Curated annotation (Swiss-Prot):
Keywords: Cytoplasm, One-carbon metabolism, Pyridoxal phosphate, Transferase. It comes from the Bacteria. GO terms for biological process: glycine biosynthetic process from serine; tetrahydrofolate interconversion. It is an enzyme of class 2 (transferase). This is 2-methylserine hydroxymethyltransferase. Belongs to the SHMT family. The record marks T234 as: Plays an important role in substrate specificity. InterPro entries: PyrdxlP-dep_Trfase, PyrdxlP-dep_Trfase_major, PyrdxlP-dep_Trfase_small, Ser_HO-MeTrfase, Ser_HO-MeTrfase-like, SHMT-like_dom. It is found in: Cytoplasm. PANTHER family: SERINE HYDROXYMETHYLTRANSFERASE, SERINE HYDROXYMETHYLTRANSFERASE 1.
Length: 425
């Protein structure tokens, strides 16, 4: 073996690329030393990490198990079939496609399957918690399809099902979508399904954020009400970055295979497929049900603690992992609060809330989530501490005295991160 070949197989990141080695080491330290409260994030298991970094990543394949366009795929077939079987069992459905590289690509494949360009879609407004891939103009789905948005009731900030029904009858959409990226309340799949059937629409549930809660039995399942379901394997499902498409319709499933490949994707990501199979297997364990219950319990404690300190909680609380704050109640913008919390080693994100400005710099909302910190082992007592720390920081910022409390807040966060380390650090 010559020197170049030996170096290719043996040199570490630090030897090959010091810049990236330093960035990776810093990111590892950031994850250990900060409390992650971004609702779309979680912390994968060591087993999932091992799969993502496995040599299986070298294998290029197109097609599906038993029907590939390349040889040498027998072991990837095992991984993909395991992921398919586990997804079907976990979500109690007849068919599963586990190849989508993301939730957005899963949604695009469903659009590709069910709709023709220009056909009508009815989905949740972005500021009310919807998602870009549900027909928003900034997304490809909004350029190809004619989307109308339903909203939340301005009094209770819960999805206005009467408005949904009225709009559905008015525009007669081909596809009704529910789900999104910042909606904290339980979804009434049964009523929505009736609305879709009433107007002859297909009913798509995007459960990207709540898939783990559905798997853990703390949120109702979209089946048997949904015609088709998409989700990510990240977020509450606690797996790698990727998507799933689920259905009970055999005829659709056969067409769906082609909608994913070659419709919107080429070769699959072999390492991610293996990691998906692992995370789906983990989600079938009793421990995961305990985890899902704790995620919701922790989010409720966080919401209640902040509400007791005068922070307005959008919709008055949460049924999921998401807690939405209306910082206009404190005279702050979302970006201000995001920057403030970062100084204390709490990671969060600004977010629009119902009725918010369309311009991100003017958003008065903040989205928090309990999934990642719950994975670290934090329970109600620790989330009460987090809520108190966040409220202290907000009140100090309003009073112009944030610098006086940041160091104390950082010390409390350091105590939590040291008590609840990640990956045995």
């Amino acid at each position: 073996m010559d020197h170049a070949t030996r170096a290719h197989f043996t040199m570490t990141v630090g030897e090959v690329d010091p810049l990236l080695a330093d960035a990776l080491a810093s990111e590892r330290g950031r994850q250990q030393n900060q409390i992650e409260l971004i609702a779309s994030e979680n912390i994968v298991s060591r087993a999932v990490l091992d799969a993502l970094g496995h040599e299986i990543t070298n294998k290029t394949l197109e097609g599906y198990p038993g029907n590939r366009f390349h040889g040498g795929g027998q072991f990837v077939d095992i991984a993909e079939q395991a992921a398919i079987d586990r997804a079907k069992q976990l979500f109690n459905c007849g068919y599963a496609n586990v190849q989508p590289h993301s939730g957005t690509q899963a949604n695009l494949a469903v659009f590709f399957l069910l709709l023709k360009p220009g056909e009508k879609v009815l989905s949740l407004d972005l500021a009310a918690g919807g998602h870009l891939s549900h027909g928003m103009k900034a997304n490809l789905s909004g350029r190809w399809f004619d989307a109308t948005n339903y909203n939340v009731n301005p009094q209770n900030e819960v999805i206005d099902l009467d408005e949904m029904e009225r709009l559905a009858e008015e525009i007669r959409p081909k596809l009704l979508i529910t789900g999104g990226s910042a909606y904290p309340r339980e979804l009434d799949f049964e009523r929505m399904s009736r609305i879709a059937k009433k107007v002859g629409a297909y009913f798509l549930v995007d459960m990207a954020h709540i898939a783990g809660l559905v798997a853990g039995g703390v949120h109702p399942s979209p089946f048997p009400h949904a015609d088709i379901v998409t989700c990510t394997t990240t977020k509450t499902l606690r797996g790698p970055r990727g998507g799933l498409i689920l259905t009970n319709n055999e005829e659709w499933y056969k067409k769906l295979q082609a909608a994913v490949f070659p419709g919107v994707q080429g070769s699959l990501h072999s390492n991610v497929l293996a990691a998906k199979a692992i995370c789906l297997g983990e989600a079938m364990l009793d421990d995961f049900k305990v985890y899902a219950r704790q995620v919701v319990a922790n989010a409720k404690v966080l919401a209640n603690t902040l509400a007791e300190r005068g922070v307005r909680i959008v919709s008055g609380g949460t049924d999921t992992h998401i807690v939405l704050l209306d910082l206009a109640s404190k005279g702050l913008l979302g970006k201000q609060a995001e920057t403030l919390l970062a100084k204390a080693n709490i990671t969060s994100n600004k977010n629009p809330i119902p009725g918010d400005s369309p311009r991100p710099p003017e958003w008065v909302g903040m989205r928090l989530g309990s999934s990642a910190a719950t994975t670290r082992g934090l329970k109600e007592a620790e989330f009460r501490v987090l809520g108190t720390v966040i409220a202290d920081l907000i009140d100090a910022e309003v009073a112009g005295k944030a610098d006086d409390v940041v160091e104390g807040a950082k010390a409390k966060i350091a105590e939590l991160t040291n008590t609840f380390p990640v990956y045995g650090q």
